[in-house]
Every structure is written in C-alpha cells, then in structure tokens.
Amino acid sequence: MKICVFDTETIDLEKCFVYNIGFCLFDTETAEIMLKEEYVIEQVWHNTALFETAYYANKKDYYSQCMRGRTIRLEKFGYVTQRMYRLFKEHEVTQAYAFNSPFDERVFAFNCEWFKCINPFDNIAVHDIRAYAVEYIGKTEEYKKACDENQWYTEKGNYGTTAEIFYRYIMNDKDFIESHTALDDSIIETAILLECIKRGAEYGQNYEVPKSLARTRTQMLEVYHNGEIVYERECNSIYKRQIKDTTKIYLKGE
C-alpha cells in the first residue's frame, strides 16, 4: 500500500495562506519513502507584504537557496494540487497522514477554495499522526520518564506532544530541533508514524486525539485537628502549577 505523509507551512493560524508544501509517498510493504517533493507557493512568495507576516518569514534566505539549488520548486498552488492529485491516482493512494492533521486539512480546504483549485484530499482519508503518537508512544511510562528527565513539558506543565519531542525520543536525540519546513517535517513525521506501526498501531485508524497529555505527580494530603496531624497519605493528582506539593486540611471543633 502507498500512503502520503504531508505538511504545510502557513503565514498564520487563522488566515492560513500556505507558502510551503512538502509530502512523501511511503510504501508500507517495504517501509521506504519512494518519492518526496517540496514546493514554495508562488502566489504567496511573490506577495511580499503577505509573506513577511509568516511565522517563519526569517527562512526566506533558506528557501531562496533551495530554489536556486532546485531542491525546492517555486510553483503556483494549482500546479501543486494537480501534481498531488495525479500522483495519488497513479500510485492508488487512499490514505494520507499529517501531524495535527485537522490543521493541514483546513489549510488545503481554505487555499483550494481561495484559488479555485481541486483539493487532492477530497477522496482521501486523512489520519492524525499526533493521535497515533500519543496513543502508542506518549502514554508509555518510558516516554513520560524521558519527558521528566529532559523537562519536555508544555507551558501548562503537561507532557509535550509535539513532533519535535516525539522525534527526539524515538531517535534518542535530545538536541534535535524541528526545522519547520514542509518536507523535513514530513520526513520526521513519517518516522514517527512508522515507530507507532512497529509498536502495534494499524494504518487507517482514527485514534482519539487528546488536547493534552496530562502529567501526574505524588502529592501529600494532611488532615489537622487542634493543630495536630490526624491523617496523612500520598495520592496522585493531575499536575497543576497552582497546586502545592502538600494539601493541608484543617478540621474545626472538638
């Protein structure tokens, strides 16, 4: 079976004009990437005011160098969608995967409507690699231990569930930094998906997508009466910054 793993880079999260698309065609029988392509979208690239609002506009020199070296092609959005559509048909692709796929699906839907182009994913089932990773990697005690050892936490103190952190873990590379370019990200996300398959996941599944991977911790519960401890025990609780390591309860009266 041939599947597509893809990624998009957009100017922002709301007006999601796409400026970079990368994808791999992956053979599930040989576990090898058989084709990979990357494009910068001409309509956004040449709109200087629009492109310079992009999250990663500082990568413009990088994209320029890649286009000069012909490792990335500058093409109109419609060309890219037609190219993907033809490749999917040629290789009988019926499944696609992306990390946090609802966002990338929204990107294609928005841009296809804006530019009046065919959506190559209209008849393709798209599955979320993040859901796979949380289910088969993130919920393991080994992964949580690695997060604790390396402080791989979110701003709210939960366990990290980004592609960057999952890739650090499976490759045992604590210094890995995600490039946030579409093809490179597609390649590392393919590796994450393959690791999940090795751990027992099945292609074509829609695993539950949690908003976060909650972190638990041991907390002391102490009950006081007339200034003395009358009960204490250890308990597990969901980590929250505002909760102290020890909870004290004071009983009134005799």
What residues fall within each predicted segment?
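Conserved non-catalytic scaffold segment of RNase H-like nuclease domains
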Residues: 2-111, 247, 252
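Short, polar/flexible loop-turn hinges at active-site or ligand-entry regions and domain interfaces
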Residues: 66-71, 115-121, 173-179
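Short helix-capping/linker segments at secondary-structure and domain boundaries
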Residues: 31, 138-144, 196-204
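Hydrophobic side chains within alpha-helical segments
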Residues: 107-108, 131, 188
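Acidic two-metal-ion nuclease catalytic site recognized across multiple nuclease folds
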Residues: 150-154, 169, 183-254
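Active-site-proximal helix-loop-helix substrate-binding element of RNase H-like nuclease domains
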Residues: 46-65, 129-184
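Substrate-recognition/cap helix-loop segment adjacent to the acidic, metal-dependent catalytic center
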Residues: 102-127
